[in-house]
């Protein structure tokens, strides 16, 4: 059958089963129906052959079997499957959840962002409208207050005007779209930091909840509630296990317990325990993050107070980074609030799938079968065989791992979620926790633990036999596929959450490693002083910078009255007399010629006797 035709047939089967269930008053999701279809086909007792095309009679039989299972409300196995499907569809690890949450926020702000970045305002009214949109954007992005609250809007407007006055809108409009978006985010963080600081000083903070106080109350309360439910579930597990362990050696008791479906109830509550541990682990991680962020928040607020004090003006280079850091921390606290809420909601919604264990196995019947049985906790079982260890010499062809010889011993992915494979196979499905201290068997790149040394030896003699038994048991009880993490053996049952974390299934032990040593070329540390300055004026500049004279009050002026009290003088270098001359004026004079002529007057008859007298001064006399 072509893939497209097969998918069409499966969809029609799922749709038909959903309609039949609805007719019987049971609303079932398509995901659960699809899981049940796979489970019914996988069960060998139903006789479906995956290698041949399904006939009409096969489809009718498949629908009938699925209907029977889905409408059997007294079956713990169905409750376990419902719990697994719900958890897989609703649980996401912290990192991916926060990434998706931020992506959703960005998509919701997309229309507001485009209205601002695509705006081409020119008139005064248009610029005022744009500024109001920026205020709304800051409020929506920060999540601190409602845009319809007048007091909150006024507070945000005042904070925004202090860092981004309306007069700067012209410069903002000239930026590229990417730069506008970046500046909007920066403005949001700065304004958020200002509001948080004002709230801490008691001068503002309208509409801002005290998130650290809320989380410090909510997280411990949630952890305490989950711890209580976890201990209650474990107590029930230990009682079920004790009865099943007692029945393993008593055929009559096994036959008597058959109608109560005790093993299915054990699988149900074990799966519930696993999910509670996952939720509790995430909440503990969140509590550690909140504690660290609360300390950082207080430190940044104190740093701001020391920087600002009572000053009228402070350089933006000093306070803006702190405001941004405050905003980032507060956003992380908001994320933690959402994570805790989602995990609490998930915890509440999986409780109904725990099943009515009182209905499955009444207390009077349980007390009757507990007579003569020893109820042991998982910790007690591990302590009993803590000293019993596998002798590696007994199995030369198999590899055994121990804590003292394996570097990443605690990080190995143990098969069957750490339960003893031999006990499960030998007792037809009893779940007992394995003890890694006995030794971890490495077989075909997979790791197995056992609850006792004898169980380890029995499994090691024929591993394939017991692995096949576990696989066949999982085909009959499909809830075991997720409970025992058998997804690699049943590819069609890999949940989405497991597919995302597929890489973690291949952690390999580090039992051997290469190491080398080498003497350092330079034993002594270098003596180069990077802060050395040869320039005297550079040293003076640094000294002035360290003194921060801009924030100090200096006195260098005296009045007529104050000069009598003390002398005030400043001097850079010792005084010295010196003079320089760049040009000197000088001149020279040549004697002016003075020559006189006499005897030029005379008659016509007389001869003129001309006398020439030279009165010019000598050059040496000048």
Swiss-Prot record:
TM region positions: none
Region ranges (Disordered): 570-592
Pfam families the UniProt entry points to: FAP206
One cellular component term from this protein's GO annotations in UniProt: ciliary basal body
Subcellular localization: Cytoplasm, Cytoskeleton, Cilium axoneme; Cytoplasm, Cytoskeleton, Cilium basal body
Keywords: Cell projection, Cilium, Cilium biogenesis/degradation, Cytoplasm, Cytoskeleton
GO biological process: axoneme assembly; cilium movement; regulation of cilium beat frequency; regulation of flagellated sperm motility; sperm axoneme assembly
Function: Essential for sperm motility and is involved in the regulation of the beating frequency of motile cilia on the epithelial cells of the respiratory tract. Required for the establishment of radial spokes in sperm flagella.
PANTHER family xref list: CILIA- AND FLAGELLA-ASSOCIATED PROTEIN 206 (PTHR21442:SF0)
Stated family: Belongs to the CFAP206 family.
Designated name of the protein: Cilia- and flagella-associated protein 206
Organism: Homo sapiens (Human)
Encoding gene, per UniProt annotation: CFAP206
